[in-house]
Amino acid sequence: MISRRAMVAGTGLMALGACSSKFKTYSGPEVTRIQVFKEKRQLQLLHNATLLKAYPFELGFAPAGHKAFEGDGRTPEGSYLIDRKNPESRYHLSIGISYPNADDIAYAAKHGLSPGGDIFIHGTPNPFSNHDDWTWGCIAVTNKEMEEIYAMVNEGTLITIYP
């Protein structure tokens, strides 16, 4: 006969096994660059010229144009690097974009304003997102997609964001 303690322990282990980790592994070709097409709402992961994966996404609440100032709701345009990964993001997982660059800082300073910062590709705190543009300038994908992107993309990867 199985003791109550063994039954409870076994049930707990089965429950843990049923939970999937948000940390995935990836053993395919290296992602050498990311392309983001704001108007088409498509994020592409590439190995040299080969498309590995493409994802739809949501943007900031004012998506047209290049991010110029903190709080403008825009996503930057241009070339940047992935400069950090955040496994503790309040948006599931996130990878940081090296905005602002020197040109962004100079432009904002010329207008006496802050360029802002903390631009990320991230998941969503609400898995039932309504798919409207809702971020403050970040690029938002589903949590499942973010798990794939997080596993595939390394710090130092080039990201180019197009209008």
Give names to the regions the model predicted.
Residues 26-49:
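Post-signal peptide N-terminal segment of mature Sec-exported envelope proteins
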Residues 50-62:
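Short Gly/aromatic-enriched secondary-structure transition segments
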Residues 1-14:
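N-terminal secretory signal peptides and thylakoid transit peptides that target proteins
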Residues 22-32, 59-83, 143:
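N-terminal post-signal-peptidase region of extra-cytosolic proteins
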Residues 17-18:
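C-terminal motif of bacterial Sec signal peptides marking the signal peptidase cleavage site
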Residues 33, 54-56, 79, 118, ...:
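Well-ordered beta-strand positions in beta-sheet-rich domains
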Residues 84-163:
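Exported/periplasmic cell-wall-interacting domains
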